[in-house]
A protein has these predicted regions:
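Bacterial N-terminal signal peptides that target proteins for export
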Residues: 1-7
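N-terminal signal peptide c-region/cleavage motif recognized by signal peptidases
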Residues: 15-16, 20
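Metallo-beta-lactamase
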Residues: 21-28, 34, 119-186
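Conserved beta-strand hairpin/beta-sheet module of binuclear metal-dependent hydrolase folds
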Residues: 24-81, 172-193
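Pre-active-site segment of Zn-dependent metallo-hydrolases
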Residues: 46-93, 104-107, 161-165, 198-207
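Active-site neighborhood of phospho(di)ester-bond hydrolases with catalytic His/Asp-centered motifs
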Residues: 50-51, 88-98, 117-120, 189-195, ...
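Active-site HxH/HxHxD metal-binding segment of metal-dependent hydrolases
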Residues: 59-62, 79-144, 155-160
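Cap/insert and terminal regions of metallo-dependent hydrolase folds
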Residues: 74, 196-257
Length: 257
């Protein structure tokens, strides 16, 4: 049984009748996986596009210094036309601006006036320089309301403490956020983002008590630290299952870069 099968088995063992997977309807709270970390979250009557990487298969060189640097990204094609990924969306959630979450194709074809939520002003300034005009930075201190939905930024770490002690690697890893979605009468959704399991993840779980947790679990690794991931992996799925037996786990960001 391979890693993907193991993770999917762990995730599917947990169910929540109030949330659907791969059901693309604004009338149903649901998550539609597209590719990599890209997906559509239908929530409380609104649709969010998450971390759009919209290039065709093999457009980009592999990430230098990673175990899969010899492979060109993305590894697979989109399951739909790129334009269909953002059809009828209300906003974009951009957890960070690494190429596998925000690529040049997305920057080119997305409507410049679309609402985009980013992790901080620095990413907001970058998007403004790319021509986007409707940007809101989320904050750890203060929630943001969007069309009756409460968005909270959550913390994390795109690698271990030891990795961030290496200045060059710390600059590459940089920052990434998670986001929680809350609305009256709807399940709480926690989009974890690109992070390893940290005290900030525990803090978010304890504070928001998610009914649904979308986890980036590809266990990506660098050549400098081959024994540690820069995002979550199988052990983190098992940990989440044990910690949150009644939470639906959705595992993504595994096999496309």
């Amino acid at each position: 049984m391979n890693l993907k099968t193991l993770i999917n088995t762990a995730a599917l063992a947990i169910s929540a009748n109030t949330f659907a997977v791969d059901l693309a309807s604004k009338n149903t709270d649901s998550y539609q996986h597209i590719r990599n970390a890209t997906g559509r979250l239908n929530y409380a009557g609104k649709t969010f596009l998450i971390d759009p990487m919209l290039a065709e298969k093999g457009r980009y060189a592999g990430f230098e210094g990673t175990l899969n640097s010899h492979l060109r990204n993305p590894l697979v094609e989109l399951p739909m036309k790129a334009e269909d990924t953002f059809k009828d969306i209300d906003a974009i959630i951009l957890t960070h601006t690494h190429e596998d979450h925000w690529d040049e194709v997305a920057q080119k074809i997305l409507p410049k006036s679309i609402k985009i939520f980013v992790q901080h002003e620095r990413d907001g300034d970058l998007l403004k320089a790319q021509g986007f005009t409707n940007i809101t930075s989320l904050s750890l201190e203060k929630p943001v309301e969007f069309e009756g939905i409460i968005l909270n930024k959550t913390g994390g770490s795109h690698g271990t403490t030891e990795m961030y002690a290496v200045p060059q690697l710390a600059e590459i890893l940089d920052e990434a956020m998670g986001v929680t979605f809350q609305a009256k009468g709807h399940p709480t959704v926690y989009l974890v983002g690109d992070t390893v399991w940290t005290a900030e993840v525990n803090k978010a779980i304890n504070r928001y008590k998610p009914d649904v947790m979308i986890m980036n679990t590809g266990d990506a690794r660098t050549l400098a630290f081959p024994n540690d991931g820069i995002i979550m992996g199988l052990q983190d799925v098992a940990h989440a299952r044990n910690m949150l037996p009644n939470t639906k786990l959705i595992t993504v960001h595994m096999d496309a870069v």
